[in-house]
């Protein structure tokens, strides 16, 4: 027997090891990786918290269950107990093992589920904003109430578990006793049997359940700030004057009932227990009836008056939660009285107007600049740089390796040779080539650079498409970039990666389920494996509690490529705040900066006033750095994130209204303007553009994220909403309210104006023929002083799989003038230099008459040949024909 016991423990350990083998391997690798990225302390925060919590929770569970068990066997008058439990010590030993396993399991489940809430509770940071009903700081609802709710659910679940296990134990033991004594089971005696077996225990548990029902209704009282019963989110008139009153009564009555129940047990009386349970149920039902009566017979007919104070609470706290309470609001009285001097004063704004559009530019990048089939550009980023002494807005993108496109896609190619992307492409947003394509200032491999921006190490080991591991410093040279006659190779000189010792090779072979780690002769002791290379997944791995922006963007600094990811703190627990997309509070509290070569990942706090990020900083010591610790050149490229701006714009459409009466009527709702990408295409929500502009009353251009608002379900533009981001102005928001008594063209209405212009629509019809298609670019509405200048790039796309859209014309509109021009500068001249600010149609017609018909035919011939070459993907012939076309057009001038 002793030998069997001696074998049991090691056998049990072996079984556990096999069951958790993969998790153990993952755990070891995680330790190595977090140590490599210098965030091991962050990783151990969770583990340390779970272990520290498990010990006292295990003791509480174990003692509670053991005492309950002892109370069941203490009565030796019942034979069922004598036979089932107290005959010998075997039952006690068996229950001890059962209790140990159950207690440690429950302790682990509780600790791993609620460690974070407990740490949030202990590290709570005040918001210095109180809710208007209970006058508690908002921090109570975000950091403390969730823990109270969790404790309530766990304790109620445990008490119900005890009740259920008591009944199960009774039925098992009763059945065993009847079988052993050869007596029939009599269901009529169950009630008496239960009382004799565990009457007092069940009564105590019932008393505790009633006590925690009292606590549960106290939680319900606090949760009224999240009520959705009224006309606005948060506690309504009915909630405050009916539901709250009944909840308070239930809290008091159930508290008294729990005491009465426990006293009744001491006196051996069970009837008061039933009465207390009955009263509790009656009050809960009565609360629902009372709330229904108040809502339908008092509130419904006087709703606007009675709900106004609660609507105001909702407005004020929703605006605070989404950071809309600090918007600078100005009236924008459209005068359309611009003079030539105004244009000259805003030359930098006009020179930076974006005539390149995102989708066509990305298509062009992926057709012309990928160089080889295994490269790709994931997306286009927009930013501002001082290029050769001038402030410019630019498009830029990183050239990454698409490992899925490799051919052959072997293990060596995928993980040892094609380890990194190479280089970046940049073009100014305000200019195109004579063919209507982006005018590059950085392009090709190795980089051809016309700027003062240094890019000496353009390798991309960490990016948006780097979804697989690589092994560097192997016996095989890494592919660096292609050359005409051969490939340039490279040896990794960064410090990222985990050394590939034999033990580590074995660990990764198991983890990746790949024997190549052990069989490969190319891997040396000095080789390193780089994992978690996708920049967003890398940030999530380190700080999974943050929410990350959908659009990371690249920055060129210190000769290398860096990535910036906007990180958000969010919650759905902000009192009285209307939820949008499952959250009712958001702050862009941190920026994550990642080195594309070394993988260094730094989290910088950019909003010190946010209590949630400060709470995280207290919990995860060593994770965050101050914003000032980021290099100045990196900080200059921090952008106001579009994801945040999009949510704020959605909220602002309803919550720009501060008057509760107007809010109740719903008479002043806005929506983000619609737009149209094709001449006869469907409409969709306009994508907010980043614009270089000089705000009214400012003397310097800056980058602003701008959204256009319409009246709900109307196309008339009613407001401009902007977020600033340069220098000390970062994060400041401004709302320009447009006159409501005038027709102000929204992007969609502007498109309709274009379609209705006979001269322009005729041109579009000619272009939009069979074989080619006209496509709108990104609409820009540029405020200049008290006027609006509309800019719309026009693209022409030939039919065919490999066709590339070309920016052919720009439509400009100012006041009632609409011109179709070859460039913004030409369009501006046409609008502001023509006599009496009118377009001289006669001169245009006269100039047209002087053009030689033979040249026109020749131009048409070269154009058709170019389109045909484009369809066939023959870019050499395409370029030749376009050059010939350009020569003819120049001769016509």
Curated annotation (Swiss-Prot):
Localization in the cell: Cell membrane
InterPro entries xref list: UPF0182
Keywords, in A-Z order: Cell membrane, Membrane, Transmembrane, Transmembrane helix
Domain of life, per lineage: Bacteria
Gene Ontology annotations for the cellular component aspect, listed alphabetically: extracellular region; plasma membrane
Major localisation: membrane
Membrane association type: Multi-pass membrane protein
Transmembrane regions listed in the UniProt entry: 9-29, 49-69, 94-114, 154-174, 202-222, 246-266, 273-293
Pfam families linked: UPF0182
Keyword Membrane belongs to the record: yes
Keyword set includes Membrane: yes
Family of the protein in this entry: Belongs to the UPF0182 family.
Name used for this protein in its record: UPF0182 protein CLM_0018
Natural source organism: Clostridium botulinum (strain Kyoto / Type A2)
């Amino acid at each position: 027997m002793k030998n069997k016991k001696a074998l049991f423990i090691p056998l049990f350990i072996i079984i556990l090891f096999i069951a958790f083998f993969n998790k153990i391997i993952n755990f070891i690798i995680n330790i190595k990786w977090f140590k490599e990225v210098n965030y091991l302390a962050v990783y151990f925060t969770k583990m340390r918290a779970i272990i520290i919590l498990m010990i006292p929770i295990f003791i509480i569970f174990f003692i509670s269950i053991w005492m309950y068990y002892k109370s069941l066997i203490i009565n030796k008058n019942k034979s069922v107990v004598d036979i089932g439990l107290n005959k010998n010590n075997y039952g006690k030993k068996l229950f001890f093992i059962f209790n140990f396993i159950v207690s440690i399991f429950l302790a682990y489940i509780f600790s791993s589920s609620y460690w974070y809430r407990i740490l949030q509770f202990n590290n709570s940071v005040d918001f210095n904003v109180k809710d208007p009903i209970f006058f508690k700081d908002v921090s109570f609802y975000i950091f403390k109430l969730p823990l109270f709710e969790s404790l309530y659910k766990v304790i109620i679940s445990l008490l119900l578990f005890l009740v259920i296990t008591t009944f199960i134990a009774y039925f098992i033991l009763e059945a065993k006793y009847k079988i052993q004594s050869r007596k029939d089971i009599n269901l009529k005696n169950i009630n008496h049997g239960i009382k004799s077996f565990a009457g007092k225990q069940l009564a105590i548990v019932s008393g505790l359940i009633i006590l925690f029902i009292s606590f549960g209704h106290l939680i319900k009282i606090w949760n009224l700030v999240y009520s959705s019963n009224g006309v606005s989110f948060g506690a309504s008139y009915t909630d405050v004057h009916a539901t709250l009153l009944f909840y308070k009564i239930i809290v008091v009555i159930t508290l008294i009932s729990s005491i009465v129940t426990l006293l009744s047990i001491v006196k051996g009386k069970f009837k008061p227990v039933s009465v207390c349970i009955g009263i509790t149920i009656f009050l809960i039902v009565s609360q629902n009836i009372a709330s229904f009566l108040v809502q339908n017979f008092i509130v419904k007919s006087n709703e606007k008056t009675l709900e106004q104070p609660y609507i105001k609470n909702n407005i004020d706290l929703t605006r605070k939660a989404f950071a809309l309470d600090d918007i600078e609001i100005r009236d924008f009285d459209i005068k359309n009285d611009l003079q030539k001097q105004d244009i000259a004063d805003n030359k930098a704004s006009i020179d930076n107007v974006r005539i390149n559009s995102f989708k066509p530019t990305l298509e062009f990048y992926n057709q012309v600049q990928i160089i080889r089939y295994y490269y790709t550009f994931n997306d286009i980023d927009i930013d501002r740089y001082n290029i050769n002494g001038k402030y410019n807005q630019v498009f830029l993108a990183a050239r990454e390796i698409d490992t899925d496109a490799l051919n052959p896609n072997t293990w060596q190619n995928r993980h040892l040779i094609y380890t990194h992307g190479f280089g970046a492409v940049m073009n100014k947003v305000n200019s195109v080539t004579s063919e209507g394509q982006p005018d590059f200032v950085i392009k090709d491999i190795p980089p051809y650079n016309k700027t003062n921006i240094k890019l000496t190490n353009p390798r991309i080991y960490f990016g948006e498409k780097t979804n697989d591991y690589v092994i560097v410093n192997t016996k095989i040279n890494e592919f660096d970039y292609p050359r005409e006659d051969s490939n340039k190779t490279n040896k990794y000189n960064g410090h990222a990666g985990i050394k590939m010792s034999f033990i580590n090779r074995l660990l990764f072979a198991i983890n990746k389920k790949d024997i190549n780690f052990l069989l490969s002769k190319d891997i040396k002791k000095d080789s390193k494996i780089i994992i978690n290379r996708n920049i967003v997944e890398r940030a999530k791995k380190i700080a999974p509690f943050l929410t990350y922006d959908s659009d990371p963007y690249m920055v060129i600094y210190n000769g290398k490529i860096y990535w910036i990811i906007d990180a958000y703190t969010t919650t759905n627990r902000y009192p009285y705040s209307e939820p949008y997309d499952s959250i009712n509070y958001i702050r862009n509290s941190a920026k994550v900066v990642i080195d594309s070569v070394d993988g260094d990942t730094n989290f910088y706090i950019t909003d010190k006033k946010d209590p949630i990020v400060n709470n995280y900083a207290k919990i995860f010591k060593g994770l965050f750095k101050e914003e000032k610790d980021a290099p100045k050149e990196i900080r200059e490229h921090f952008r106001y994130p579009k994801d945040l701006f999009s949510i704020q714009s959605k909220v602002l459409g309803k919550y720009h209204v501060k008057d509760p009466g107007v809010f109740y009527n719903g008479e002043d709702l806005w929506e983000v303007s619609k737009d149209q990408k094709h001449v006869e295409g469907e409409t969709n929500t306009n994508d907010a553009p980043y614009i270089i502009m000089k705000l009214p009353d400012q003397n310097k251009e800056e980058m602003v994220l701008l959204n256009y608002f319409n009246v709900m379900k109307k196309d008339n533009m009613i407001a401009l909403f902007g977020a600033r981001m340069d220098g000390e102005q970062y994060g400041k928001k401004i709302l320009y309210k447009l006159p409501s008594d005038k027709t102000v063209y929204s992007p969609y209405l502007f498109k309709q104006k274009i379609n209705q212009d006979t001269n322009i629509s005729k041109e579009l019809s000619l272009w939009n023929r069979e074989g080619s298609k006209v496509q709108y670019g990104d609409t820009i509405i540029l405020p200049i002083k008290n006027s609006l200048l509309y800019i719309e790039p026009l693209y022409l796309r030939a039919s065919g799989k490999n066709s590339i859209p070309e920016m052919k014309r720009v439509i400009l509109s100012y006041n009632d003038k609409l011109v179709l021009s070859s460039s913004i500068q030409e369009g501006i001249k046409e609008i502001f230099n023509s006599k009496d600010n009118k377009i001289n149609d006669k001169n245009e017609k006269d100039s047209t008459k002087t053009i030689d018909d033979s040249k026109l035919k020749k131009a048409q011939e070269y154009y058709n040949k170019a389109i045909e070459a484009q369809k066939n993907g023959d870019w050499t012939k395409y370029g030749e024909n376009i050059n010939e076309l350009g020569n003819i057009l120049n001769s016509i001038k």
